[in-house]
Amino acid sequence: MRLIKRPSLFLFILVFCVSNYINSQNREPFKENWKSIEAVNQAPDWFKDAKFGIYAHWGPVSSAFEGADPDKWYAGWHGMKMYVDGKIVPQPNGKPSNNFVHHSKKYGHPKDFGYKHIIEQFETTGFDAKKWADLFAKSGAKFAGPVAMHHDNFAMWDSKATRWNSMNYGGIDPSAALKKEIEAKGLKFMGSFHHAFTWKYFAPAHAHGGIDPKDYDLYTNPHALDSDTPDAQFYEDWWAKLKEFIDVYQPDLIWFDWWLENMTEESRLKFLAYYYNKGLEWNKDVAVCYKETTFTETTAIKDYERGRPNQPKENPWLTDTSPGAWFYRPGAQFKSPNELVDILVDIVSKNGLMLLNVPPNPDGSIPQVMEDLLIDMGAWLNINGDAIYGTRPWIVFGEGPTRLPEGGHKVEDKVKIAYKNTDIRFTKKSDKEFFAIVMDKPENEIVIKTLSTEIGALNSRILKIELLGSNETIKWERTKKGLVIQSPKAFPTDYAHAFRIVLEGYTENNIGGDVGAHED
């Protein structure tokens, strides 16, 4: 092997850096209009390759139900629902919310013990950024980060834009600590923002009155319950916090929750142009995820909460989901690793990615059940990652009896899906390599009908088939009824099973130079 001499290596690095700098300078800055922003590569390759990310819902509101059976109480929305007394802030049934009842018993009337007092009790002794990042990496995630600001207007970083932050109340900067540890693991860093809804979130608090004007920087300025029009101060504060996080932490991805679609188009365009231009300045491809109609699929990445399309989409998309509640909830029921792996496989087959939530304990430690779940997912991905990471949709996404009856938000809540061993999902690595993922353990032979010699979906000869994680020789035959794979003696995992299908490659006949071949 010929070693590169030091001057040559230095010259190579110099040329590479200068080339990258020139390329970044040659790209036109984005302007605050849709036409300009549509020139962005809204789904960079790193995002399309990643397939799996993690964020964590943790903050002062996590302590609201500590030691209590929450039943149907809202956790993350406690700062809003705690003021719903059924009278001043009515409900259709005329009764107070479960949150109001619980809060009154635990803390006293919310007019006397408001949300700001919950913030003042924020406990962070269990938070360990290195442990979080180690676990995220073990799970197989390729990007991760905190919920930087939820509906409660509380900054999970050392903010100068708001005094309501984790350094002033908690003594830590989780965003800085997580960025350092997450990037040290080779993962991309993200932050999520939910504070567009803050205007509606704290409207019930204002209905009760008595808020000290000096605390309007938390609760927003007084406004009516039915107000959907934030004032100028709200827009100024919303942008200042978001801009500060971008400037200080240089995230690879910004994810937005709903209600941003109700803010002005001007404010949304201002963000997109600023953040994408920052990406040019940092010389890295950044990404934005959104819900509803906030942006367009040519300017950012569409997200589906606890849902997904029932067919593949041309543009990459994202599902944000949680194995249990979004925030800590005692006694919460969690999805199994098997369920989450199946959801991930179905998502990836349709050109999507999964953003999985982790709900830490109130003190910032991660529950053992969540840790076990993530390690199990990581073990599956360690074996089957070739069928997930860096793949693209095949010509069809799958076959089998189990399909989503509809696509969109919250379909996971509407329909209980249990995939069977006759459900197959496909992913593609290249023109000569794709994967058939069997969603449950086969009992006998596996028949993939899509690959029948009669259908014509596959226009290449199969060279070999392998089961990921196994050294066993796989026996197979392609017939009129489909690709028939004999079940191996043992499977390397307990969940979905990925078969690598290696192809000869598509070739076309050439006419050649024989004159006779060209005669009609």
Locations of the language-model features?
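Mature catalytic domains of secreted/periplasmic carbohydrate-active enzymes
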Residues: Q25-D520
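Bacterial Sec-dependent N-terminal signal peptides
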Residues: M1-N26
